[in-house]
A protein has these predicted regions:
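Active-site neighborhood of HAD-like aspartate-dependent phosphohydrolases
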Residues: 1-46
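Receiver (REC) domain switch/active-site residues of two-component response regulators
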Residues: 13, 147-148
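An amphipathic alpha-helix signature
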Residues: 23-31, 66, 70, 130
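Conserved H-loop
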Residues: 143
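A conserved mid-domain beta-alpha-beta active-site/ligand-binding segment of alpha/beta enzyme cores
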Residues: 159
Length: 159
């Protein structure tokens, strides 16, 4: 069976490195900023609904999340949110594009061993924004281990 395996593909976010905790922290700061307009739970629910509505147009990633945060802020505030607060939201979103890459334990060592064996093609197959994912891979220090990088707008069974 081992001889049949020629390619090993890895997801990136929350497989090779931690990602979701950064989004959760930004969402907490976002809901704190919008407290004058509702509870954290209500604002989070509104943000989630906006993200789901925008998914087919914007896809996944920090940029789509940022646009959804701005849209939700305008909605929950009845268009009353200040320009200063909108700028703060944009800065929250930009911070996701610069977040530190924290590899999960053993990732680099595992990839090194697999690469050195030379028996497998190693691939990253992940969803999200192309530029953001390429930048994260570069910041991770893992790019040299992979033979191919595939960033798609969504991962479905047919893809």
């Amino acid at each position: 069976m081992k001889e049949l395996i020629k390619v090993i593909a890895f997801d990136a976010d929350d497989t090779l490195w931690s990602n979701e905790p950064f989004f959760q922290e930004i969402e907490k700061q976002y809901t704190d900023l919008l407290k004058p307009y509702g509870t954290s739970e209500d604002i989070s629910a509104a943000l989630f609904q906006t993200e789901m509505n925008n998914l087919k147009y914007l896809g996944y990633g920090a940029k789509a999340f940022t646009i959804s945060m701005v849209e939700t802020a305008l909605h929950v505030s009845g268009q009353k949110i200040s320009g200063t607060d909108i700028q703060h939201i944009i800065e929250l979103g930009k911070s996701l594009l610069k977040m530190p890459i924290e590899l999960f334990p053993g990732v680099k060592e595992t990839l090194k061993v697999l690469k050195e064996k030379g028996k497998y093609k190693l691939v990253v197959a992940t969803k999200g924004d192309l530029l953001d994912q390429e930048n994260k891979l570069g910041r991770s220090g893992l790019a040299s281990y992979f033979d191919h990088i595939e960033v798609m707008s969504d991962k479905t069974e047919k893809e």
